[in-house]
């Protein structure tokens, strides 16, 4: 079988599962199709509407016409948690006339990367994804509970960067790393965050589209691995009232495409003028992009909590209270860490 996946605007995997022969046939006759409305579908299954409870006709045809899923074969991978051989491939969404679907997240990102390419810039990103492991919770009316690890005990205190606290779930993370290796998801460091059974996994830095695809696949991978170990994994921004929220910190830098030099760095002032302008752009447009940074009602519980989620667009060197932190002032590591986005 082949899973044809497309990330919707909430990062949920939509698509179709096809027999291999039907998948191959669909490559020639464009029969891999879904309704256009998937890109205005919310995480709860409803549809995004405007203030008058109308669908946004500028990005949606009221007849809910088909769109075509075009596989991006650079993303084809084995699905490692199935017993039967199964492949997965991320698809680009195109209209029936062959034009890109404008509200597909991959279309938007490709357009942005083309703008950088025209300026001879090469953007580099590295995500840090936080999440919670929790006991299975089939009834959402009940609050989430901290799971029990290998020791048979439930974590009660805050174990920020605790090694043994991570090792409580070592069998799970062994599977996560193995699954990721099979899928070419380049995860790096894991550490315990300040919440009970709250973890963070870092990704290797690289191309923004490739990293976006990897994070999309990683979330699905972690959830499946957790289920195997009779746990749930959640990327909710604020899943438990008395625990810290979960963030998706995005480290970002710019290289000169020709000589691969970090153009955020200046020998004279350490921070280049272009980097200051870049930060200014983030400060200007982040408030307008909060539906992206905080897409759900729950997202704002994280931002208004008393924990270390930033509630500003200030920047500072090594300052975690700022929305935009500069972790290093050396040439190789000169970058901006956007700390505003939730993990959802």
Give each language-model segment a name.
Residues 7-10, 26, 39, 210, ...:
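C-terminal accessory/tail domains of diverse enzymes
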Residues 129, 193-201:
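Short, conserved phosphate-binding/catalytic loop or strand-edge motifs used
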Residues 198, 203, 210-280:
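Acidic, glycine-rich loop-and-beta core segments that form the ion-binding/anion-interacting portion
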